[in-house]
């Protein structure tokens, strides 16, 4: 099952199983990899406007699955509000005995934000979704 959503004008609209989406603000996709694994693919900008939608989505996925992988490869901007959401999701996963992994390519925007803030060590980080899935075993 695949879920796709797109944030427009402060509202998240579910678009079902449609083809690839592009948005100037935020693109969120959730793919099930078995009953207890979700991959959340994030594209666009994670800022004060879009971070609450990501927060809601990650909270829901952590309630539904024991492993959530957040693929940040297509993120063009990761602000402090986005970092806060990722940190809160990591804390939630720890409290609920769940696992959260971030996919952060070395040359990506998300990696720059994690390095600039020194927060990279606070997260489980892998360079690819496959590596995150393998490392989580």
Question: Positions of the model-derived regions?
Answer:
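STAS-like cytosolic regulatory interaction modules
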Residues: 1-74, 88-137
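The feature encodes the CheY-like receiver
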Residues: 78
